[in-house]
């Protein structure tokens, strides 16, 4: 059986995902067969695993860090929020059903078996499994039936390292408070802790380490500084959108409306990494900028609801003005569906309005269908005649006159649509901006020249940098025990 360690946080967004990815890369660089695992994730940023089915995009990144094929068993339970209190449940890569918060709490004991089964499959043949928790184990109101944190750790017998985020303040209280609130059994699972996102002279926290050890008895396994390489990794969830810089003045301005159920927005990361692109995330209450050259409508977990919110913000008027001024639009997946004349959901798959008019920028219509398309794809752009690699995760079938001008040939089949003048583009293919040749030609069409970086290589380099930093700042004795 593989060795295993689980990183849990004092809260959400403390940096667990990046630390797990960095540790996976560090272990892989030392020749270990290492695998990531997250029992339960909640995210609309999904990936298609190499063995088919959906997993959280973060676990796909961690598998890349581990230099291992991605598997649905690396993230056996994925919750994809569709409304304020309801989610689609993906179990071992396949749609299990829909559930609201209280109903899901009753389902969790049933899902624990799938989680433990997947953990065994991931551990088989591995030297090391690095597990990521979700949220915080201190949420004792959710402890009964828990499968994401201590409920999993105790059943699987996996020791826990607690991660505290010093950048947000209150890290000592967070760690000591977690110690105080856990019961004896859960507390005994914690082997130590890591301080993450430290800025400045690390020695200034020496007294803090002594204080935490005095209150908890836990050893410190390292104080990790702010990791610049983390900014070059794909964004994990919508929390990140709230703090992304708006970009660089004087560059090509690309506007992205941020809708409540935005999905797979890591599609935009390759554009965000370009030095001559200003990617503007437009929040509620703001207008689409009049000087944007391109507007991108990203994916959505609930197209009809997000389309209603789009109109409520007045962005439909802004978008039509943008097009009249000669601006261009790209819609991906749910964004593509919004660009058509009508979106129908006669079976109530999204659980709300059965039919709504679209933005009518493409002469197409979409009918929601129960069968979900989930696959990795190879394609070729019809706009620029360059290869594309990406993936599809969508419900619905889109058809209409503009589909006679497909934006790509995906797995040998026409996909998407182009307007007659070529300024409006729709596609179901996620990941197209990560295709370097396509991104280069797209930016050239706006007058930008210059060499484009290899996006995949930049992610690989960032992972290696993070692994090197962890090797430098984590306790060498703890690392030696972990990595063997």
From Swiss-Prot:
Gene3D superfamilies in UniProt: 3.40.50.880, P-loop containing nucleotide triphosphate hydrolases
GO molecular function terms listed in the Swiss-Prot or TrEMBL record: ABC-type vitamin B12 transporter activity; catalytic activity
The protein's annotated pathway: Cofactor biosynthesis; adenosylcobalamin biosynthesis
Residues of the active site: 333, 430
PROSITE patterns referenced in this protein's UniProt entry, alphabetically: GATASE_COBBQ
InterPro entries: Class_I_gatase-like, CobQ/CobB/MinD/ParA_Nub-bd_dom, CobQ_GATase1, CobQ_N, CobQ_synth, GATase_3, P-loop_NTPase
Transmembrane helix listed as a keyword: no
Listed Pfam families: CbiA, GATase_3
Keywords tagged on the record: Cobalamin biosynthesis, Glutamine amidotransferase
GO biological process: cobalamin biosynthetic process
Domain annotation GATase cobBQ-type: ranges: 251-438
Claim: Ribonucleoprotein is one of the keywords in the record: no
Family: Belongs to the CobB/CobQ family. CobQ subfamily.
Function: Catalyzes amidations at positions B, D, E, and G on adenosylcobyrinic A,C-diamide. NH(2) groups are provided by glutamine, and one molecule of ATP is hydrogenolyzed for each amidation.
UniProt name for this protein: Cobyric acid synthase
Source organism of this protein record: Rhizobium leguminosarum bv. trifolii (strain WSM2304)
Lineage: Bacteria, Pseudomonadati, Pseudomonadota, Alphaproteobacteria, Hyphomicrobiales
